[in-house]
């Protein structure tokens, strides 16, 4: 166990170290910082590294087997109303627990937190149920996505313009470290228990559909709720001068994030307890292992969220402000490329996705290749976001052509890549995006006198869009190179079914 934890921490070190070095270089060149603020950032980086290590191991031990077990049992029960109700409730409950959603709700000042949170949760619940029905009835993911995105853009034209960016960002932040491991595992369990040659390809796509639900529901909220404006609350930067101030900032925030994470995990643990009472699905040894996994997950999330919110968010705002106020505003674009390329590696849910992709494709799509594809995509997204900050161009000029390209590609790549790509979009836009990239864009927009709501907000949506294109282009290259992945998908689906059935005996 200790060896596995050390391995996960080493992996997280390699993920967080590049972005830490980038900020250090900027702090001694273009954007000088006070020593206290820099110390806050470095302490946050340490917490990120350790927290990611604990979280990845914990999710592997607890969330993944729970999701697979629930998904498999739902299919075997063959009761459609039960499947729909259970999936809706699970989607809504886990979304309410998502830390990223709490961050978003706090930033949208004009909508009461509970209204926004419950609206988004209902959206995820509805679309998780729809995603499960898609797997069971073998509906084409690419066709379903095309229909839903057309409806989405039609709906967006009837919603107030202030809500467009808010809505698209809501789709990105709701699929974070809490929801991704569980929802992906449910998909694996469902498709494995389906026992057919296309099961493995259909194990992806749940996160993609769950990301659409919040966008649609927030757009509807904008139409019917009629708030006066969707203003965001800026990041508050507390003066930090001495090392005592640094320690105090973390000590003060630690209980809040501990409470937040424990409240977030309680519904998931409740699902395990109820599921075990009703089905007796897990042996005693498995339950002990899963319990330890939940403890690791809680520790990891507390450390990660404390580090990223206390250490990273203020620095992101300072970097954006400093670069925009300098005589070299255009440096926001090349620096955005570098930050975007490396920051996605520090998203905890990304590593969970990459591991599951590598496992399910038998190594044909490795973690390294997935990391490169996601990094290139997010780098492009941050560049577009910085261009929007500097020029004020409408988000529609980016997202509409982007989704047209992504949906067009979905008809020319192996089916497994479509699911992976659209899932990657939701996964890439996690807490690092909402607590570092968003403050970066907001700081820059404020410094140049732009409209923060329409110009800076939307960066999460662009980060969620970019992997859709990047990963599918990777799929095109794979198909032209050897055609290995589609064949592998058929072989793997049988292997997964055998392993799943053996566990149940």
Residue ranges and their predicted role:
Residues 25-39, 59-67, 93-108, 127-138, ...:
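Transmembrane helix-loop junctions in multi-pass membrane proteins
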Residues 17-30, 44-54, 86-93, 123-134, ...:
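Hydrophobic core segments of alpha-helical transmembrane domains in multi-pass membrane transport
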Residues 9-15, 39-45, 73-82, 141-146, ...:
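Alpha-helical transmembrane segments and their helix-start/interface "positive-inside/aromatic belt" motifs
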Residues 1-12, 16, 67-81, 195-206, ...:
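Intrinsically disordered, low-complexity non-transmembrane regions of multi-pass membrane transporters
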Residues 72-73, 80-151, 329-410:
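Helix-loop-helix junctions within the multi-pass membrane cores of secondary transporters/permeases
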Residues 39-40, 58, 105-117, 134-150, ...:
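Transmembrane helix-loop boundary segments of multi-pass membrane transporters
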């Amino acid at each position: 166990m200790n060896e596995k934890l050390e391995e996960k921490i080493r992996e997280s070190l390699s993920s967080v170290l590049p972005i830490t070095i980038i900020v250090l270089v900027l702090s001694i060149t273009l954007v000088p910082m006070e020593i206290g603020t820099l110390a806050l950032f470095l302490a946050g980086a340490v917490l990120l590294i350790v927290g990611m290590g604990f979280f990845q191991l914990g999710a592997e031990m607890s969330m993944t087997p729970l999701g697979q077990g629930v998904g498999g049992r739902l299919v075997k029960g063959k009761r459609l109303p039960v499947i729909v109700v259970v999936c809706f409730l699970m989607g809504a409950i886990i979304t309410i627990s998502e830390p990223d959603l709490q961050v978003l709700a706090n930033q949208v000042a004009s909508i009461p937190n509970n209204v926004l949170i419950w609206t988004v949760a209902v959206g995820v619940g509805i679309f998780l149920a729809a995603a499960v029905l898609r797997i069971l009835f073998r509906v084409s993911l690419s066709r379903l996505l095309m229909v839903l995105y057309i409806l989405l853009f039609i709906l967006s034209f009837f919603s107030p313009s202030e809500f467009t960016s808010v809505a698209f960002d809501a789709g990105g932040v709701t699929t974070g470290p809490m929801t991704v491991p569980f929802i992906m595992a449910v998909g694996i369990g469902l498709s494995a228990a389906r026992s057919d040659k296309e099961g493995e390809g259909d194990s992806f796509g749940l996160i993609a559909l769950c990301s659409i639900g919040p966008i649609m529901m927030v757009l509807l909220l904008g139409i019917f709720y009629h708030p006066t404006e969707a203003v965001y609350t800026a990041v508050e930067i507390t003066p930090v001068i001495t090392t005592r101030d640094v320690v105090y900032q973390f000590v003060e925030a630690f209980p809040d994030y501990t409470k937040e994470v424990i409240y977030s995990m309680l519904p998931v643990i409740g699902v395990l307890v109820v599921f075990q009472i009703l089905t007796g699905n897990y042996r005693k040894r498995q339950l002990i292992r899963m319990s330890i996994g939940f403890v690791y997950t809680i520790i990891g999330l507390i450390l990660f969220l404390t580090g990223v919110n206390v250490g990273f968010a203020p620095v992101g705002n300072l970097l954006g402000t400093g670069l925009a106020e300098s005589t070299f505003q255009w440096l926001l674009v090349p620096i955005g490329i570098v930050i975007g390329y490396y920051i996605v590696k520090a998203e905890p849910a990304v590593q969970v996705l990459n591991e599951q992709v590598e496992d399910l494709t038998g190594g044909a799509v490795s973690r390294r290749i997935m990391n490169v594809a996601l990094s290139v995509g997010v780098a492009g997204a941050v560049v577009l976001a910085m261009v929007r900050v500097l020029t004020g161009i409408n988000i529609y000029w980016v997202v509409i052509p982007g989704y047209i390209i992504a949906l067009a590609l979905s008809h020319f790549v192996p089916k497994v890549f479509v699911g992976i790509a659209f899932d990657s979009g939701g996964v890439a836009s996690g807490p690092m995006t909402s607590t570092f990239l968003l403050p970066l864009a907001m700081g820059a927009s404020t410094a140049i006198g732009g409209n923060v709501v329409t110009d800076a907000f939307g960066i999460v949506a662009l980060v969620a869009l970019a992997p859709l294109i990047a990963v599918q282009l990777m799929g095109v290259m794979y198909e032209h190179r050897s055609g290995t992945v589609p064949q592998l998908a058929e072989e793997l689906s049988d292997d997964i079914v055998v392993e799943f059935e053996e566990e149940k005996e």
